[in-house]
């Protein structure tokens, strides 16, 4: 482990201390390590061949012409990435889906971009977490 010194302006330090208090970190080093991991993962993982798991969250208008069929077809075309999906009816027209994905980061990002760009998908976000080992667990 390396010891480093950083300089932060007062406003940023106050915001960091607020995060530390809310999340219950024992010290600033733990918080900064977590924030650094998150920042590195967000900037590099989506374009890599690194294996990861992810949660794809999006809302869509199910009454848009052919959208449910297009989404279903996309999931069948990417069945190797999708592990499970939870579907929630938010109101008469709006649905929320949360899908757990597993695969290479670049493939997950490509799939999510495809889903999010469909007409009628209103909001989408992909959160990925790199996995430590390259072995896939199967239930065969």
UniProtKB/Swiss-Prot annotation:
GO BP term, example: response to nickel cation
Keyword Cell membrane among record annotations: no
Keyword flag Manganese: no
Cofactor note: Binds 1 nickel ion per subunit.
Residue numbers binding Ni(2+): 76, 87, 89, 95
Keyword line: DNA-binding, Metal-binding, Nickel, Transcription, Transcription regulation
Cofactor: Ni(2+)
SUPFAM superfamilies linked to this entry: ACT-like, Ribbon-helix-helix
Sample GO molecular function, one term: nickel cation binding
Family indicated by similarity: Belongs to the transcriptional regulatory CopG/NikR family.
Function: Transcriptional regulator.
Name this protein carries in UniProt: Putative nickel-responsive regulator
Species, as recorded: Rhodopseudomonas palustris (strain BisB5)
């Amino acid at each position: 482990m390396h010891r480093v010194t950083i300089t932060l302006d007062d406003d940023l330090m106050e915001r960091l201390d607020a995060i530390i208090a809310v999340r219950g970190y024992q010290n600033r080093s733990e918080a900064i390590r977590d924030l650094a991991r998150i920042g590195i993962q967000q900037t590099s993982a989506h374009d890599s061949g690194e294996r990861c798991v992810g949660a794809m969250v999006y809302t869509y208008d199910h009454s848009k012409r052919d959208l449910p069929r297009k989404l279903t077809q996309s999931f069948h075309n990417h069945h190797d990435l999708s592990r499970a999906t939870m579907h929630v009816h938010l109101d008469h027209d709006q649905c929320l889906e949360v899908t757990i994905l597993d695969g290479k980061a670049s493939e997950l990002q490509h799939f999510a971009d495809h889903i999010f760009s469909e007409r009628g998908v209103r909001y989408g976000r992909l959160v990925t977490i790199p996995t430590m080992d390259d072995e896939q667990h199967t239930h065969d």
